[in-house]
Swiss-Prot record:
Heterooctamer of four alpha and four beta chains arranged as a tetramer of alpha/beta heterodimers. It catalyses: S-adenosyl-L-methionine + H(+) = S-adenosyl 3-(methylsulfanyl)propylamine + CO2. The record marks K112, S113 as: Cleavage (non-hydrolytic). Belongs to the prokaryotic AdoMetDC family. Type 2 subfamily. The keyword Lyase applies. Its EC number is 4.1.1.50. One of its GO terms (biological process) is spermidine biosynthetic process. The active site is at S113 (schiff-base intermediate with substrate), H118 (proton acceptor), C141 (proton donor). This is S-adenosylmethionine decarboxylase proenzyme. The modification Pyruvic acid (Ser) is found at S113. Binds 1 pyruvoyl group covalently per subunit.
Length: 264
């Protein structure tokens, strides 16, 4: 499939890329935990997320039709963008006074091409570990590939653990009428990751090729305790404290990576 396919009519394939990105930290006191949540809330507020998604849309070569964003109380934010493969000119009657589109009309387009992000800061009630999760979905219809946004999104967040799902649905036809269920070569999401990303992460694939379903899990190879402490540093901890915190953080990260709780 290295050559460009000649299609009959519009490319009806829907390509969906989903991320779950986790940032883990240890905040020793309740005050530090609250400060971490506040920091994350500010660092990834709706305005910042809107800029990240705007960059994503530009990277994949799409055009923004509509933006909806919201910061939540006590914490968290979300942004949704409707996008199109080609720039959509305003309708001829856009300057006339008339009722706007019904919600159904907007949601109908959401089923085709959209970019969304939702954030979920949280903390353990008594062991000092706090996590931040960002869920990102990039769904496109047509020739646009969401895979182009892979590396940018991973590097836009403090990504300790990343879970990625990519699927292609629907079919399009070539000029002879034969159905095509995928229009590009892929055997792993890892093929689309930059070399520095591949070197930084340990990765596991679970792929169902016959269903055009690809799944990759990533966890940072290097563990530097100082990078995971919020409000304190390794120099302020004795050897036993540092060892205990390191063990708890690594256990937390492995549990999230494998999606299962582990015995103490």
């Amino acid at each position: 499939m290295s050559e460009k396919l000649k299609l009959h009519g519009f490319n009806n394939l829907t390509k969906s890329l989903s991320f779950n990105i986790y940032d883990i930290c240890y905040a020793q006191s309740e005050k530090h935990r609250q400060e971490y949540i506040a920091y994350i809330d500010e660092q990834y507020n709706a305005e910042r997320l809107t800029q990240i998604l705007t960059d994503v849309v530009e990277i994949i070569g799409a055009h923004i039709l509509n933006v909806s964003r919201q910061d939540y109380d006590p914490h968290g934010a979300s942004v949704t963008m409707l996008i199109a493969e080609h720039e959509v000119p305003p309708p001829a009657d856009s300057s006339e006074e008339s009722p706007g589109p019904l919600p159904d009309a907007v949601v109908a387009h959401l089923d085709k091409s959209h970019v969304t992000v939702h954030t979920y800061p949280e903390s353990h009630p008594d062991n000092g570990i706090s996590t931040f999760r960002a869920d990102i979905d990039v769904s496109t219809c047509g020739l646009i590939s969401p895979l182009k946004a892979l590396n940018y999104l991973i590097h836009s967040f403090d990504s300790d653990i990343v879970t990625i799902d990519y699927r292609v649905r629907g079919f399009t036809r070539d000029i002879d009428g034969a159905k095509l269920y995928i229009d590009h070569d892929i055997n792993s999401i890892q093929n689309f990751l930059s070399e520095d990303t591949q070197e930084a992460y340990q990765m596991i694939d679970v792929n169902v090729y016959q269903e055009n379903l690809f799944h990759t899990k990533m966890i940072l190879k290097e563990f530097n305790l100082d990078n995971y402490l919020f409000g304190t540093g390794v120099s302020e901890l004795n050897a036993n404290e540092a060892s205990n915190i390191r063990e708890r953080l690594q256990k937390e990260m492995l549990e999230i990576f494998y999606s299962r709780n582990m015995p103490y």
